[in-house]
Regions:
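A short glycine-rich, His/Asp/Glu-containing loop-to-beta-strand
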Residues: 1-22, 74, 79-82
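Conserved hydrophobic/aromatic beta-strand scaffold that supports enzyme active sites
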Residues: 8-10, 31, 47, 55-57, ...
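Glycine- and acidic-residue-biased ligand/ion/polar-headgroup-sensing regions
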Residues: 27-44, 54
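Short acidic-glycine-tyrosine-enriched beta hairpin
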Residues: 13-14, 44-62
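A short, N-terminal "cap"/entry segment at the start of jelly-roll beta-barrel domains
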Residues: 1-7, 49, 56-57, 85
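Ligand-binding loop in jelly-roll beta-barrel domains
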Residues: 40, 60-85
């Protein structure tokens, strides 16, 4: 895919932290894998908790924000396809 690159990032969410604001994934599809802890994904008015293992896909229809409601750090690996800078 000319002009694009595969990006992999690791995020650590401290207990009580929020990853926002509300954002979308138009133009940068991806997926998330949870390594440790629990992350709550908020989309379409629904909060879904994900623990260690496969998380969620992110596509052109994804608009969401995330938080760690737990008492321990949550760690995720996020992989997406982005336009090359």
């Amino acid at each position: 895919m000319a002009g694009y690159e595969l990006r992999m990032r690791r995020f650590t969410f401290a207990p009580g932290s929020v990853f926002g604001p509300l954002h979308d994934h138009r133009g940068r599809p991806g997926l998330v894998y949870i390594l440790e802890g629990t992350i709550t994904d908020h989309r379409d008015g629904i909060a879904t908790e994900y623990g260690p293992g496969p998380g969620w896909p992110e596509d052109r229809n994804t608009t969401h924000w995330l938080e760690n409601r737990g008492t321990v750090p949550a760690i995720e690996v996020s992989v997406d396809i982005v336009r090359r800078a």
